[in-house]
Every structure is written in C-alpha cells, then in structure tokens.
Regions:
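N-terminal low-complexity or amphipathic/hydrophobic leaders
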Residues: 1-18
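Short alpha-helix boundary/capping elements
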Residues: 7-8, 23, 112, 141
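A short, ordered amphipathic alpha-helix with a cationic face
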Residues: 3-7, 73-76, 102-104
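Internal, conserved structured core segments that host functional sites
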Residues: 12, 17, 24-93
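Conserved catalytic-core motifs characterized by acidic clusters
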Residues: 1, 30-37, 157, 175-176
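Short, solvent-exposed segments of well-ordered alpha helices
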Residues: 2, 41-44, 48, 102, ...
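A contiguous pocket-lining binding segment that forms or flanks enzyme active sites
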Residues: 78-126
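C-terminal auxiliary extensions adjacent to catalytic cores
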Residues: 106-176
C-alpha cells in the first residue's frame, strides 16, 4: 500500500521533479521542490532525517563533482535526501526511470531488511517478499514518472502519528 499511496510514492514524484529541474538548470524549481518536500513531511523527526541524509549526500556529491555545488547551494540551508539524490543522478545524466526504480527499491529493501532483523523473518522470506513486491515497485515507478503536480499527495496509515510518538521516545532502536 505504501508504494502505491504512501509518502514514498510522493517522494518518487518529487525525485522526478528535482531531476528535471537539474536537467533544465532551473535552480528556482529545484529550491521550490526542496521547500515543498520539507513542508510536506509530517513530523520534525522525518524532516530532520531527510535533511541529515541530504546533507551527507550533498557533501559527498560536492566532493566528487564540484559542479554540483551551485545546485546544492540553490536548496538553501537544508537539502532533503530525495532532492540530493535526484540532483546527483541528473548531473551524472543517469536514465531517469532507472534512478526512480533504484530509489524506490532502496526504500523497499531497507524496510524488508529491518523486518528480517527485528521480527525475524529470515533472509529467504525477505527475498521472497522483495520479489513479490516487484509489481508494486513497477507501478510506483510508473506513477512517479507520470504523475501531475495537482495529484501529489499520500496516505501513510498513521505514519505521522507513529513518527510523532517515536520522536519523543527516550531510547530508540534506529536513528531517525
């Protein structure tokens, strides 16, 4: 469900917008989508997670490709991970469908790997789940590539409420 209707589905479309902005050398549009994604996040914890990962990826990207610096600076004080990912992929002229699919697959794989460790599911079952979810991954990739701006939005089954509770915990299993 999350791949079809959740935040990650919207994130895929935001990745496409960032990629297109860099391809068109449109720094204002890149800044807009970075701010849009920051505002769209449900909780401070989710925003901070995205900013921290984005900051790290921007640092790495800038060290590898000095030409990326203007794009990173266009984002302002903070750069979301999805924006940094799309920016670097576009700068390297990677095929957009592959970039979106890889991004969404990474999200899916990380979630299943957490389940393999915590539940425990076992490695084989985890791989079977990845394989079974391939049609949903293809759907989400297609949706991200074709979705119009006015159709953006998501439904994450209480993710915002859970994140709100999680960000106030004294001890956590995973850094967010």
């Amino acid at each position: 469900m999350e791949l079809r209707y959740g935040a990650i589905a919207t994130e895929g479309t935001v990745l496409v917008r960032a990629f297109d902005a860099v391809q068109n050398q449109d720094l204002e549009t890149l800044r807009y989508w970075n701010q849009w994604w920051s505002a769209w996040r449900d909780t401070e914890e989710l925003r901070n997670q995205s900013w921290q990962m984005g900051r790290s990826l921007c640092r790495l990207g800038g060290a590898l490709e000095p030409g990326l610096v203007p794009y990173v600076q266009a984002c302002g004080e903070v750069c979301n991970f999805v924006i940094a990912f799309g920016t670097i992929a576009a700068y390297w002229q990677l095929p957009l469908p592959d970039v979106v699919s890889a991004y969404l697959y990474s999200w899916l794989s990380n979630g299943i790997n957490a389940g393999v460790r915590l539940i425990p599911l076992g490695q084989t079952l985890g791989q079977q789940m990845l394989l079974a979810l391939h049609p949903s991954l293809e759907y989400a990739t297609h949706k991200a590539l074709t979705q119009e701006d006015q159709d953006l939005g998501g439904w994450s089954h209480g993710m915002g409420m859970i994140s709100s509770q999680h960000e106030s915990l004294y001890t956590r299993l995973f850094q967010s």
